[in-house]
C-alpha cells in the first residue's frame, strides 16, 4: 500500500508489511494461558517441518479503509474493526462520525464469525493496525480495537492481550467474562497495563436482552479483576444491530476520556494476588502429599483462572508434574 495522501473510503486495499505482534509466537504468548501456550509450542517443535510464524498471507487479503479528510493536529486515531460478517465494509452512517473524531477505520474481509480466531481474525486485526500506522500519522495513544457481536468478543481478547497497542475497545453488542480458558489473563505486566490504561466501552441496544446480559456478566468480571476503565452505554430503540451514528458518537467520545483512578484498586489487586498464591500453594501441598492427579487437576484450574498471573510458578509446577 502506498496511499498516505489518500482519504475517504477505499475498498479492496492490500497491505504488504508484517509485524512480530501478529506472528504465532506472540499470539500464543499473549492470547493463550501459559500451559496452553506451552503445549502449542511443544507441538510445533515436534513437527518435522516448522510452520511459518505468520499464518496470514497478505497478498491474498483485502481490507476496507476509511480515512477522514482532515488530519487532527496530534495525528489520526485508529479503529481496527473485527466484523461478524465476511464482507469488508464500513457500517452505514459511521463515516461522518469518524470524520468528527478524526478516526481512521480499517477492517479485514473474510474475518467474520466463521473464520478461525487465532489463525485469521486476530492476526488480520493486528496486521491492519500495523500497516495503517506505517502509512498514516497515527496518535499511538488513540489506537482502538472494536467489533460487533462475535467480532466484539474477539476485540475484547485483543484488547486484553495487546494493551500496549490497543488503548481502548468498543464492544458493540458482544462481550465475555475474562479469566477462563477462552479469555485467559495475560502476563502481569500486560494485565496491569490493561487494567489501568484501557478503556472498555460496552454499547448494546436497549432491546438486545441476551447481549445486555452478556455485558453484565463481562462487567462483573472486570470488577472482580480490578479493571478501571469500564463504561456502559445503551443504544435506545434498537435490538441486536450495529450502532447508529449518535450512539457511536457517544461511544467514541467515551473512548477518549481519561480513566479516573479507583481508590479501591490497590486492595482489589492485593485480593487477586492472595488468591493466586493460595491456589498455587494448594497445588504444592497436593504434590507434597503425593496426590499427583489431584495436583494436576488443580494446576489446570490455576492456569485457566489466573493465566499469566500464576506464571512462571505454574510452568515450574507443570514440569514437576510432567504435564504435557
Per-segment meaning from a language model:
Residues 1-76, 279, 283, 295-298, ...:
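A domain-start/cap signature at the N-terminus of enzymes
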Residues 1-12, 60, 225-229, 246-324:
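Alpha/beta-hydrolase-fold serine-hydrolase catalytic core, especially in secreted/extracellular enzymes
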Residues 89-108:
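Short amphipathic alpha-helix adjacent to the substrate-entry channel of hydrolases
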Residues 68-75, 113-150, 165:
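Gly/Ser-rich "nucleophile elbow"/oxyanion-hole loop immediately N-terminal to the catalytic nucleophile
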Residues 87, 141-195:
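Primarily recognizes the serine-hydrolase "nucleophile elbow" in alpha/beta-hydrolase
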Residues 74-85:
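Short beta-strand element of the alpha/beta-hydrolase
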Amino acid at each position: 500500500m502506498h496511499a498516505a495522501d489518500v482519504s475517504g473510503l477505499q475498498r479492496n486495499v492490500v497491505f504488504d508489511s508484517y509485524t512480530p505482534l501478529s506472528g504465532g509466537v506472540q499470539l500464543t504468548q499473549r492470547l493463550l494461558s501459559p500451559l496452553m501456550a506451552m503445549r502449542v509450542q511443544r507441538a510445533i517443535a515436534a513437527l518435522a517441518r516448522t510452520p511459518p510464524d505468520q499464518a496470514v498471507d497478505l497478498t491474498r487479503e483485502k481490507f476496507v479503509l476509511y480515512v477522514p479528510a482532515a488530519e487532527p493536529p496530534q495525528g489520526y486515531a485508529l479503529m481496527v474493526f473485527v466484523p461478524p460478517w465476511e464482507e469488508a465494509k464500513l457500517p452505514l452512517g459511521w463515516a461522518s462520525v469518524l470524520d468528527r473524531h478524526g478516526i481512521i477505520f480499517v477492517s479485514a474481509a473474510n474475518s467474520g464469525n466463521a473464520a478461525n480466531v487465532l489463525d485469521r481474525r486476530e492476526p488480520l486485526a493486528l496486521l491492519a493496525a500495523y500497516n495503517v500506522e506505517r502509512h498514516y500519522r497515527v496518535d499511538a495513544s488513540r489506537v482502538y480495537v472494536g467489533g460487533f457481536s462475535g467480532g466484539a468478543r474477539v476485540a475484547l481478547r485483543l484488547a486484553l492481550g495487546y494493551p500496549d497497542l490497543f488503548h481502548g475497545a468498543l464492544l458493540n453488542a458482544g462481550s465475555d467474562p475474562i479469566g477462563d480458558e477462552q479469555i485467559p489473563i495475560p502476563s502481569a505486566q500486560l494485565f496491569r497495563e490493561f487494567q489501568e490504561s484501557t478503556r472498555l466501552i460496552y454499547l448494546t441496544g436497549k432491546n438486545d436482552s441476551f447481549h445486555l446480559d452478556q455485558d453484565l456478566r463481562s462487567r462483573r468480571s472486570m470488577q472482580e479483576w480490578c479493571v478501571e476503565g469500564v463504561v456502559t452505554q445503551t443504544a435506545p430503540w434498537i435490538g441486536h444491530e450495529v450502532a447508529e451514528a449518535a450512539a457511536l458518537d457517544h461511544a467514541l467520545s467515551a473512548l477518549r476520556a481519561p480513566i479516573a483512578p479507583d481508590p479501591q484498586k490497590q486492595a482489589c489487586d492485593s485480593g487477586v494476588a492472595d488468591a493466586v498464591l493460595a491456589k498455587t500453594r494448594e497445588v504444592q501441598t497436593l504434590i507434597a502429599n503425593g496426590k499427583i492427579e489431584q495436583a494436576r487437576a488443580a494446576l489446570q484450574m490455576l492456569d485457566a483462572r489466573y493465566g499469566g498471573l500464576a506464571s512462571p510458578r505454574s510452568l515450574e509446577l507443570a514440569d514437576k508434574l510432567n504435564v504435557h
